[in-house]
């Protein structure tokens, strides 16, 4: 019986199975032992197999056979990968881990065959993983050198640093002198290029300078600016040894060690304190200006009260605007879109937009020439965004009347190319405009639309909506009242009620969708 201090290691559950297997393979132990020696090229004169507690001599370093050890294994310490070793190979004292019944019968454990010691196969192209394959049905523990689990040597990609000779080159215009020490470069720039005369305007002519020739009104400002090129940081923190190019930055940094925050917010009721005046100024703007920090990307109208929130937005959406782009936007600002009103023609007047019903996406009756399942892509509504805001529903596009606006189905990724409106069983103009109908039919069809994007028609009475639909011509006599659902799944264009409408395509009524221009990065 096992004691509580001794780990079980699955010995109680597999004792009987292991004993039966060892009895069956007992007679084949000697044959397997010699076959293993022939495979490894070793010579062994002993007819009896090795002791149960010792692994095969070919896989442990034997001082008698140093030249006969397989070259695939090194002199590193052995690693046992077996989770439940069937033999006593993993015993620390070399004794057998068999059950007391097997030890009393004198049964010997089966020796591992040559198949059990197959070499490891690593996956090519995966240097960071330690994937290996163990032979199935192995009878013994697999011993591997510890060096097998060391990753292959990686080429350390160091950050590209400029050579010292290139760093100590004066990049002033028409200079290019070399220096051995940084202080020599700093003295050279200060003495020969930074002129003490005020008439020189203290202009920086360093190669690649972001100021583009703009000068300074004081010599000390010019000297501080030159440190950004020479990388000179003469002011060092005595606590953490950080260096700074400006003395003011060192003073602000020292406050992080002392905890001093002398700058208090002047807003009444706000007692926030800051270690520098710049942070206090940014905070004060949040009290007097409504979200002063805004995104400068054209078309993005996000504003924030904190500059860190704006930086997170720019990083998340990639709305980086360079200095040159900001100057171009100031010279030629983008036109602002007109505000939509119920009486203006900024939205598409009288245009029917066809979208797939959710039931059509999951295997409804297919349209002629329409591949199913449909890819998750939006319809191409670029042709609908050409309204210029004309009154009376006119001027939607050049050469097109106000109530006739063809859908651009040729560029639609949902439809095969070439695919026109004829594949829907309708001519091009049959998708647009309204038709004469009764007020009751319009109200009945309105309830059959599954969803409304923007309720712009709520500003008008039902009588005005009906009169507006009657004023538009009806090509081919198609009853397209606001809210009418077209049964396009069968190929015809007859109006259907929700009870008899099969899962197909849905037509959004005019006036319920507002098309807004958007800038996509």
Curated annotation (Swiss-Prot):
Tissue localization of expression: Expressed at high levels in kidney, and at lower levels in heart and lung.
Location in the cell: Nucleus speckle; Cytoplasm
What is the protein's major site of localization? nucleus
Q: Which GO terms describe its cellular component?
A: cytoplasm; non-motile cilium; nuclear speck; nucleus; transcription regulator complex
Q: Which Pfam families match?
A: zf-C2H2 (PF00096), zf-C2H2_15 (PF23561)
Query: Zn fingers (C2H2-type): where?
Result: 168-193, 202-229, 235-257, 263-287, 293-317
Q: Which domain of life is it from?
A: Eukaryota
Post-translational modification summary for this protein? C-terminus cleavage is induced by interaction with CTNND1 and enhances by Src tyrosine kinase.
Gene3D superfamilies named among the record's database cross-references: Classic Zinc Finger
Give residue spans, biased composition: Polar residues.
Answer: 487-496
Chain residue ranges for the region called Transcription repression: 148-171
Region feature (Disordered): 41-63, 84-110, 436-501
Cite the entry's keywords alphabetically: Activator, Cytoplasm, Developmental protein, Differentiation, DNA-binding, Metal-binding, Neurogenesis, Nucleus, Repeat, Repressor, Transcription, Transcription regulation, Zinc, Zinc-finger
SMART domains, sorted: ZnF_C2H2
Region listing for Interaction with CTNND1, in residue ranges = 35-174
**One GO BP annotation here?**
nervous system development
Instruction: Mark out the compositionally biased spans (Basic and acidic residues).
Output: 455-470
The record places the site described as Cleavage at 287-288
Query: What segment(s) does the record annotate as region Transcription activation?
Result: 71-137
- What ranges does the record list as Pro residues composition bias? 49-58
InterPro entries assigned: GLI-like, Znf-C2H2_ZIC1-5/GLI1-3-like, Znf_C2H2_sf, Znf_C2H2_type
Entry function: Can act either as a transcriptional repressor or as a transcriptional activator, depending on the cell context. Acts as a repressor of the Hedgehog signaling pathway. Represses the Hedgehog-dependent expression of Wnt4. Necessary to maintain the differentiated epithelial phenotype in renal cells through the inhibition of SNAI1, which itself induces the epithelial-to-mesenchymal transition. Represses transcriptional activation by CTNNB1 in the Wnt signaling pathway. May act by recruiting the corepressors CTBP1 and HDAC3. May be involved in neuron differentiation.
Query: Hey, which family's this protein in?
Result: Belongs to the GLI C2H2-type zinc-finger protein family.
Which PANTHER family does this UniProt record tie to the protein? GLIS FAMILY ZINC FINGER 2 (PTHR45718:SF8), TRANSCRIPTIONAL ACTIVATOR CUBITUS INTERRUPTUS (PTHR45718)
UniProt note: domains: The C2H2-type zinc finger 1 has a major repressor function and is required for CTNNB1 binding.
Q: What is this protein called?
A: Zinc finger protein GLIS2
Q: Which organism is it from?
A: Mus musculus (Mouse)
Q: Which gene encodes it?
A: Glis2
